[in-house]
Amino acid sequence: MPQDCACRKTDRYVSFQDIDCTGNARRLMEHLDRQLSIPGRSTAFWEYFAKKRAGSAAAKPDDLFLIHSNINQFREFFEQWNDSDALSLLLQIEEECC
């Protein structure tokens, strides 16, 4: 007989209930903002990304869409700067929300 685990288990294929995709995406962007505020960490790509993130008067893309669209760049950036907390959160977002 399987034992019940008190740990949180989510399954996006059953329901997005109890998965805070928007909040997790916002937290990951906070990690990105902290890293990019350190001199020497921004690149031409991240400057371009900041413009996309700001959006236009007509529309502003949401954080989850931007993460999903640039997931490999996020992974490479956080690996480069050894941000294990951001990498863990990125993996969680990828598995639960993308």
From Swiss-Prot:
Q: Which domain of life is it from?
A: Bacteria
Q: Name one GO biological process term.
A: nitrogen fixation
Q: Sorted alphabetically, which Pfam families does this protein's record hold?
A: CowN
> NCBIfam families from the entry?
N2Fix_CO_CowN
Protein name per the record:
N(2)-fixation sustaining protein CowN
| Gene name of the encoded protein | cowN
Keyword list, A-Z: Nitrogen fixation
| Function text | Is required to sustain N(2)-dependent growth in the presence of low levels of carbon monoxide (CO). Probably acts by protecting the N(2) fixation ability of the nitrogenase complex, which is inactivated in the presence of CO.
- Similarity-based family: Belongs to the CowN family.
